[in-house]
From Swiss-Prot:
UniProt protein name: Uptake hydrogenase small subunit
Positions bound to [4Fe-4S] cluster 2: 228, 231, 256, 262
Residues holding [4Fe-4S] cluster 1: 61, 64, 156, 190
Membrane topology type: Peripheral membrane protein
Protein family (similarity comment): Belongs to the [NiFe]/[NiFeSe] hydrogenase small subunit family.
Principal location: membrane
Cofactor: record remark: Binds 2 [4Fe-4S] clusters. Binds 1 [3Fe-4S] cluster.
Cross-referenced SUPFAM superfamilies: HydA/Nqo6-like
Modifications the protein undergoes after translation, according to the UniProt entry: Predicted to be exported by the Tat system. The position of the signal peptide cleavage has not been experimentally proven.
PANTHER family documented for this protein: HYDROGENASE-1 SMALL CHAIN (PTHR30013:SF6), NIFE / NIFESE HYDROGENASE SMALL SUBUNIT FAMILY MEMBER (PTHR30013)
Reported function: This enzyme recycles the H(2) produced by nitrogenase to increase the production of ATP and to protect nitrogenase against inhibition or damage by O(2) under carbon- or phosphate-limited conditions.
Amino acid sequence: MSQLETXYDVMRRQGITRRSFLKYCSLTGRPCLGPTFAPQIAHAMETRPPTPVVWLHGLECTCCSESFIRSGDPLVKDVVLSMISLDYDDTLMPPRHQGTVEETMRKYKGEYILAVEGNPPLNEDGMFCIVGGKPFLDQLKHAAKDAKAVIAWGSCASWGCVQAAKPNPTQAVPIHKVITDKPMIKVPGCPPIAEVMTGVITYMLTFGKLPELDRQGRPKMFYGQRIHDKSYRRPHFDAGQFVEHWDDEGARKGYCLYKVGCKGPTSYNACSTVRWNEGTSFPIQAGHGCIGCSEDGFWDKGSFYERLTTIPQFGIEKNADQIGPRGRRGSGAAIAAHAAVTAIKRLQNKGDQA
């Protein structure tokens, strides 16, 4: 391995100066690891060759790739040309023979990362998704055989997404239903945030292992908190200030979108912290509630505009006379439930850190 060209060697060959390299390492770690990890990122890139990656596509809309190529920190060109060796991706590479996959599997047996976008259909022996004249189901099993680890990009690969919506005539399934003997990290979202995708790759390059995962197989660094808890509209939820109808006074004042269907209280993602388009905005900031696209089964859970629960809410600006005995009971239950979920989450985090 020492004779192989390291990621740093590749960058120097591309004309990158030492100063620019160190700046790059600092910026690369900022979204996911923090600037203090820049020395570790630099050491990893100086001592390890680019990680070989095979990226396959099944039943999907390619939105994960569309998100990935818009990463700002790091830029996708730096990821693809310097950090990893993207040996095969039929969307992001020039036309090449399918033999490229076989060559990578032979050359880097047990060392390459298999990234999967989309999912396999099981019905009719996988004939509902044919890539290069072969069922994607068979290609997926074959490519995973000698992989070091597997990345499930997006909700299609992680949960099944709309392809698996009832009645699911193609029997589309998430990839963990097919690949059961490999370390796997799920990066759900429809699509995932670009910097979340490149952040996962950065972590794996830096530490040579998968990041810490939650019980559903998602990286805790990005999926460890509810969107609701970090949303700038959260104070309006606590104050009982809600948008009741689209374009009402509450909507114009930026009140909480919970009553018009926002799934932020039950969705775990980095949307309210990392945000989209290089930190510019996210759906709730743009005035639309979260649809919970990173959560399993979101596509079959009813309208995006249905309220999560009918339990009454009350806020800090209302007094007991306005709420009434009935409202106090219902609202108290709602707040108790909300507080309980938050407290349980904090205890779980403390337990994980212990």
